[in-house]
Amino acid sequence: MLKAAGIGVRLAGRWLLEQVNLEALPGEVLAVVGPNGAGKSTLLKTLAGEIRPTRGSVSMAGKALADWPARERACVRAVLPQNSTLAFAFRVFEVVLMGRTPHSRGLEGERDRQIAREAMAAAGVAHLAERLYPTLSGGEKQRVQLARVLAQIWEAPPDSPRYLLLDEPTASLDLTHQHSTLAVARNFAHRGAAVVTVLHDLNLAAQYADRLALLKDGKLLVVGVPDIVLTPEWIETGFGLQTLVMRHPRLGCPLVIPLGSASVLQPGEQLAHGK
C-alpha cells in the first residue's frame, strides 16, 4: 500500500497541499481528479518521493518512503511524468530498455530485453522499436515512455507490490490511445499493482478507475468509488460546473454531461444521478 498520512506541501510561502490522507491499494486504479491548480501533480510527485512533504509522511509497503534505498524503490515504483525530455537519438527499443536499469545496473540480459519487448507490445509501440525517438510524434513519445515505466516494474521482487504513478498519461493522446493506455493501466492493476493516475477527463476516470480522489485548492474533498465522487454536487463543488450525471447505458458507470458554469436548467429538469 502507498499511503499519504496528513501530508502538506508548502512552497514559496503557499500551501500546495493541506492535510491530505490517501491510500493507493494493490489491485486498484486510483484516479486523482480536480481543476487546474488543485495540487494533483504535486500530490503525485509527493507520493513518488520527488517532493518531500512539509508536514505528514508518505509510506510504501509499510515503510517510510524516505527510508527506501533509491535502487530498491526504483525496482518496485515507476513514475510517468507529464513531460519526458530526451533529445538524444536513441532507438525506441533502447529507450524502453532503460526502464530495466534499476534491475540490471546497465548490464541488460536477455530477460530484460524480453521484458522490454513485452512492455512495448502492451503499450502498442512494438512497431516503433527501430525508430529514432526524436522522430516520433508527441503521442508516440508518450506511449514509448509508458512502455519504459511498465518495463521498469514489469516483474516485482518476491513478496513486494508494485506501484505505477501516471501524471496525465492521456494528455497528448488521441481518443483510441487514451482508452488503450488506461486499459493497460487497469490490466496492470489486475496483475496486483497499485496504480495512481492524474486525469482531467471525468468520464475516463469513471470508466477505468476503481476509486477517485477529488482535489481542490490543495485539499482532498472526497475519495471513493465513482458513484460516490461523480455526483452533480461534488462536481459543482470541485469544478464550479453544473452537470447532469447519468448511468452509462452500456458500461454502467457514471456518465458526466457538462451544462456549463452558468447554465440554468429548464423548468422541471433536475440534476440526476443514476437515471
Swiss-Prot record:
Q: Which CDD domains match?
A: ABC_Iron-Siderophores_B12_Hemin
Name the keywords, alphabetized: ATP-binding, Cell inner membrane, Cell membrane, Membrane, Nucleotide-binding, Translocase, Transport
Q: What is its main location?
A: membrane
The Gene Ontology terms for molecular function here are: ATP binding; ATP hydrolysis activity
List the residue ranges forming a coiled coil, or say none. Answer: none
Give a yes or no for keyword Lyase in this entry.
no
- Does the UniProt entry include the keyword Cell inner membrane? yes
- What does UniProt give as GO cellular component? plasma membrane
- Give the SUPFAM superfamilies listed for this entry: P-loop containing nucleoside triphosphate hydrolases
Name a Pfam family for this protein.
ABC_tran
Q: What class of enzyme is it?
A: translocase
The way it spans or sits in the membrane comes to: Peripheral membrane protein
Q: Which residues bind ATP?
A: G34, P35, N36, G37, A38, G39, K40, S41
NCBIfam families referenced in this protein's UniProt entry, alphabetically: PRK13548.1
* Function noted in UniProt: Part of the ABC transporter complex HmuTUV involved in hemin import. Responsible for energy coupling to the transport system.
Question: How does it associate, per the subunit comment?
Answer: The complex is composed of two ATP-binding proteins (HmuV), two transmembrane proteins (HmuU) and a solute-binding protein (HmuT).
Name assigned to this protein: Hemin import ATP-binding protein HmuV
Source organism per UniProt: Gloeobacter violaceus (strain ATCC 29082 / PCC 7421)
